[in-house]
From Swiss-Prot:
This is Holliday junction branch migration complex subunit RuvA. Belongs to the RuvA family. Residues 147-200 are annotated as: Domain III. Its main location: cytoplasm. Has three domains with a flexible linker between the domains II and III and assumes an 'L' shape. Domain III is highly mobile and contacts RuvB. Homotetramer. Forms an RuvA(8)-RuvB(12)-Holliday junction (HJ) complex. HJ DNA is sandwiched between 2 RuvA tetramers; dsDNA enters through RuvA and exits via RuvB. An RuvB hexamer assembles on each DNA strand where it exits the tetramer. Each RuvB hexamer is contacted by two RuvA subunits (via domain III) on 2 adjacent RuvB subunits; this complex drives branch migration. In the full resolvosome a probable DNA-RuvA(4)-RuvB(12)-RuvC(2) complex forms which resolves the HJ. The RuvA-RuvB-RuvC complex processes Holliday junction (HJ) DNA during genetic recombination and DNA repair, while the RuvA-RuvB complex plays an important role in the rescue of blocked DNA replication forks via replication fork reversal (RFR). RuvA specifically binds to HJ cruciform DNA, conferring on it an open structure. The RuvB hexamer acts as an ATP-dependent pump, pulling dsDNA into and through the RuvAB complex. HJ branch migration allows RuvC to scan DNA until it finds its consensus sequence, where it cleaves and resolves the cruciform DNA. It comes from the Bacteria. One of its GO terms (biological process) is DNA repair. Residues 142-146 are annotated as: Flexible linker. It comes from Rhodococcus opacus (strain B4). One of its GO terms (molecular function) is four-way junction DNA binding. Keywords: Cytoplasm, DNA damage, DNA recombination, DNA repair, DNA-binding.
Length: 200
């Protein structure tokens, strides 16, 4: 099992980064906030979780152990897999997620694409007593510029990948870019996620 990866950041996309360690490039899936804290050409270290399936082995990266533990905890809920767990961490930062679960805040949880009212209620019931076991040690991860290409297209693609309908993703992206046309891809993506969360 690969518990962490440290090395030079070779590539940063909207849903993953490639980090070279000992001559091997590891593709690590991560949230926009985590990816925004990386910089191409510099050394980085991510705590990782490896998900092994019959036809794939996928690495998920996190800035700290707390986020990784929450990722694992979310998957103990029936119907929540790695993709939905990552979408949850993309919309709700660890402290906000812990608070939502501890307080039974179903509204906050349903901001995540793919989580309806019943799913949110199930998460609260199953995880409310477990979130206290997960520490609260991390700070916010700073955001940075993303890769090339059309910023709008990259953001829409990332939002659709997280489970938002294409039309909603396009509307949120257009709204964010109209207000702040000079935004970097990462900051615009965070703003679009925030906007979509409020309108759900």
């Amino acid at each position: 099992m690969i518990a962490s990866v440290r090395g030079e950041v070779l590539e940063i996309a909207l849903d993953h980064a490639v980090i070279e360690s000992a001559g091997v490039g590891y593709r690590v899936n991560a949230t926009p906030a985590t990816l925004g804290g990386l910089q191409r050409g510099t050394e980085a270290r991510l705590v990782t979780a490896m998900i092994v399936r019959e036809d794939s082995m996928t690495l998920y990266g996190f800035p700290d152990s707390e986020s990784k533990e929450l990722f694992g905890l979310l998957q103990t809920v029936s119907g929540v897999g790695p993709r939905l767990a990552m979408a949850t961490l993309a919309v709700l930062e660890p402290e906000a997620l812990r608070s939502a679960l501890a307080e039974g805040n179903v509204t906050a949880l349903t901001r995540v694409p793919g989580i309806g009212k019943r799913g949110a209620e199930r998460m609260v019931v199953e995880l409310r007593d477990k979130v206290d076991a997960v520490g609260s040690t991390s700070g916010a991860v700073p955001l940075g510029a993303g890769g090339g290409g059309s910023v709008r297209d990259q953001i829409v693609e990332a939002l659709v990948g997280l489970g938002f309908p294409a039309k909603q993703a396009e509307q949120a992206t257009d709204s964010v870019l109209a207000e702040a046309p000079e935004s970097t891809t990462s900051s615009a993506l965070r703003s679009a996620l925030s906007l979509l969360g409020k309108t759900r």
